[in-house]
């Protein structure tokens, strides 16, 4: 026991004693648990109050009663070799809801949030408690030790103790005991997708496959593989390359089993985060890779995924993309489609979007590749000068990952037989971080509207615009009504930001609205810092929306532990698809 003297100050958001000196040593050999018993981890529900609760106790030991409830599956951060699990106390009302699938922490505007009328912004959900691995690493003398692979709805049956730590803007309890886990309900059975009826219905899906890169070193790409020198905007290390061929194959297998299994093999998938590399083609049912760039205008990883789907008992898929849609590090959006039901139509020079004179009426100057005749086709434009960039931006174009527009014919009874439906699909991957790049993301919505308007003017009534929009559906928003943001420089903008507003105003129907009305407990696609949220959506024109039979989210990723081999076809991505 010692007495110190110093000045209390803040340094990089940490409260510290500076200019500290030792005054005296009062005692030695003190039993820590006797003299300073662990405080109870009972944070207030209000987020601001919860921050004060934790900050006042920074560095102190905490006790968490047995039977705490997991609200976010274990996440793992490779850069720090750390894992984290978010929980709430077992005596919190959320943990005791009658429907076990509602025992989640929903963002404030969600209908199943803990308080307030639906759509309101209220307490910020301060009841969340973060458990991390540093204490376990210290006790095991092994810096690779991770906290147990909890999944959402698990119960931690043992009591936990640990010291309070602050890093990356979060307070966490560095637990000294491994959580003992008992599984709750299976997240994958939370209102899962159903099978489309052959010959009567067809299914579309969005799917962010989370950095689906292979282990091939693309000789035509300077930022593709460890040891490459880098390229403009991208510097080593390239941590999106899988650690081994086995890791890559496991990623493919998990995705394939999901698509062939609980997703029921949708007719058309709008894919995000595939690698743009194209040095391979499929020959006799196997990958044939060489030293020819742009080998067959199909992304290699998605061709390999199509083979894995076939191995998993699914149908045969083909894939297509426009490589102009890739960003600097090689991420691209694309399409996968069943060859027994879906036909990718030939590119038409007269097409209002895919042709050589697209009629996309947008106020920014179109990029040169917009005039290419291609199906699918990436489209982009210069970012207009008047866009508010106070919250940041990516580059000088509207998109860093341009949307892919594809024209498909969906046949009821096989290609070339009977009745068909023509559909335009737009695969989107908007700029990341909902509370940043606000002006740019709003323009990305407006550009989608311009594409749909061009198609509508030409009589193409059926359009689906889907993907990872990286912001929330109405009424959710990164900024509450009246909240100031983007204040550097002044004047501030005032919330809500309504970044998807152009899509709603144009009359497009967000299928999430149907999902949340029918199965609100299942209306989400992502889990961030212990709160579920929706980033992945599909917007439909009225002609397409009229025929909607069902929309469901497949919860076999966001609720399952990362880097855990014990879950088959679970946790293959950090996003859940909608079907």
Where are the predicted features?
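Solvent-exposed loop/turn segments at secondary-structure junctions
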Residues: 9-12, 23-24, 136-137, 209-214, ...
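N-terminal, active-site-proximal structural segment of metallo-dependent hydrolase catalytic domains
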Residues: 124, 174-334, 340, 370-395, ...
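Metal-dependent phosphoester-hydrolase catalytic domains
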Residues: 148-166, 170-172, 177-191, 339-402, ...
């Amino acid at each position: 026991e010692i007495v110190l003297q110093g000045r209390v100050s803040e340094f990089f958001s940490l409260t510290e004693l500076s200019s500290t000196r030792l005054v005296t040593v009062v005692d030695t050999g003190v039993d820590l648990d006797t003299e300073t018993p662990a405080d109870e981890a009972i944070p207030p529900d209000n987020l601001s109050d919860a921050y004060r609760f934790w900050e006042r106790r920074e560095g102190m030991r905490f006790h968490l009663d047995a039977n705490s409830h997991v609200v976010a599956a274990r996440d793992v951060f490779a850069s720090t070799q750390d894992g984290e699990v978010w929980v709430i106390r077992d005596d919190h009302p959320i943990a005791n809801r009658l429907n076990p699938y509602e025992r989640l922490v929903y963002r404030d505007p969600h209908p199943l949030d803990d308080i307030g009328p639906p759509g309101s912004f209220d307490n910020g959900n301060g009841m969340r408690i973060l458990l991390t691995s540093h204490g376990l690493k210290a006790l095991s003398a092994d810096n690779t030790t991770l906290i147990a692979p909890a999944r959402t709805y698990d119960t931690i049956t043992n009591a936990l103790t640990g010291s309070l730590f602050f890093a990356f803007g979060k307070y966490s309890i560095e637990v000294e005991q491994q959580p003992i886990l008992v599984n709750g309900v299976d997240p994958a059975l939370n209102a899962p997708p159903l099978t489309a009826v052959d010959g009567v219905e067809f299914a579309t899906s969005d799917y962010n496959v989370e950095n689906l890169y292979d282990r091939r070193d693309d000789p035509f790409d300077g930022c593709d593989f460890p040891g490459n020198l880098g390229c403009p905007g991208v510097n080593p290390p390239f941590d999106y390359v899988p650690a081994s061929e086995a890791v890559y194959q496991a990623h493919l297998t998990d995705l394939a089993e999901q698509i062939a299994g609980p997703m029921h093999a949708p007719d058309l998938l709008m894919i995000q985060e595939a690698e743009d590399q194209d040095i391979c083609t499929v020959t006799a049912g196997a990958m044939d890779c060489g030293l020819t760039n742009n080998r067959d205008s199909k992304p290699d990883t998605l061709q390999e995924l199509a083979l894995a789907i076939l191995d998993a008992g699914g149908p045969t898929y083909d894939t297509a993309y426009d490589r102009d849609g890739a960003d600097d590090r090689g991420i691209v959006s694309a399409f996968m489609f069943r060859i027994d039901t879906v036909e990718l139509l030939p590119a038409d020079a007269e097409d209002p979007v895919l042709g050589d004179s697209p009629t996309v009426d947008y106020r920014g100057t179109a990029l040169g590749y917009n005039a290419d005749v291609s199906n699918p086709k990436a489209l982009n434009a210069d970012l207009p000068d008047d866009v508010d960039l106070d919250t940041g931006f990516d580059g000088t174009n509207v998109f860093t990952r341009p949307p892919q527009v594809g024209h498909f014919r969906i046949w009821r009874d096989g290609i070339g037989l009977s009745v068909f439906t023509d559909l335009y699909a737009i695969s989107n991957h908007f700029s990341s971080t909902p509370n940043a790049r606000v002006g740019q993301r709003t323009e990305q919505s407006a550009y989608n509207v311009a594409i749909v308007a061009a198609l509508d003017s030409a009589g193409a009534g059926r359009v689906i615009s889907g993907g990872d929009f990286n912001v929330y559906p109405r009424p959710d928003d990164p900024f509450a009504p009246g909240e100031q943001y983007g204040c550097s420089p002044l004047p501030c903008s005032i919330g809500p930001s309504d970044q998807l507003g152009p899509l709603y105003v144009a009359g497009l129907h967000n299928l999430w609205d149907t999902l949340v009305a029918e199965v609100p407990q299942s209306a989400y696609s992502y889990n961030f810092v212990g709160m579920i949220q929706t980033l992945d959506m599909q917007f439909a024109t009225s002609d397409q929306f009229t025929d909607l039979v069902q929309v469901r989210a497949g919860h076999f990723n966001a609720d399952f532990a990362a880097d855990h081999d014990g879950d088959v076809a679970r946790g293959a991505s950090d996003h859940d698809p909608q079907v």
